Design a protein with these regions (language model features):
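Short, structured beta-strand/loop micro-motifs enriched in basic residues and often containing a Trp
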Residues: 70-79
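OB-fold/S1-family single-stranded nucleic acid-binding modules
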Residues: 100-124
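Short nucleic-acid-contacting surface segments enriched for D/E, G, S/T with interspersed K/R
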Residues: 79-94
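Bacterial N-terminal signal peptides
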Residues: 8-18
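Conserved hydrophobic positions within beta-strands
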Residues: 39-41
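Sec/Tat signal peptide C-region and signal peptidase I cleavage site
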Residues: 19-23
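Short aromatic-glycine-enriched beta-strand elements
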Residues: 47-58
Length: 133
């Protein structure tokens, strides 16, 4: 009987821990479709577990808006050749990303085109660049 109780408790703990971990890796707060934006790099944070690129984008009225672009972690980006010197403040970049569902200025990066026209998958999927980007 003691074994069944211990096994039951183990299963309950495993399920209780698995749900928050799965939720952390959900992309449910982003829309499913891609959007393209162009802006000027303000900050780059190549960190774990997720890297961030902050860019200034002009809105419909020409007013500058700060956008936060979420990417895979530093280690995943290093594997595709992204280093601390890859993007610099002042660089103009283009991003193909999934916009936040609430409409705020943020997105989950898919592809990023740097100032030299090089395109990389910043979502960690190692996908080939789309032909129309």
């Amino acid at each position: 009987m003691r074994f069944k109780s211990a096994l039951g408790l183990t299963v309950i703990c495993a399920v209780a821990l698995a749900v928050p971990l799965r939720a952390h890796h959900s992309h449910g707060n982003y829309v499913d479709t891609f959007m393209d934006i162009t802006g000027v790099v303000k900050e780059v944070h190549l960190v774990v577990p997720h890297s961030w690129v902050y860019i200034e984008v002009k809105d419909e009225k020409g007013e500058p808006q700060m956008w936060a672009l979420e990417a895979t972690g530093r280690v995943g980006l290093q594997k595709i050749g992204v280093t601390a010197d890859y993007l610099k403040p002042g660089d103009t970049i283009k991003a193909r990303c999934h916009h936040l569902r609430d409409g705020s200025n943020g997105c989950l990066l898919g592809f990023l085109k740097d100032k030299n026209g090089d395109v990389k998958d910043w979502d960690g999927n190692n996908a080939p660049p789309p032909a129309d980007f």
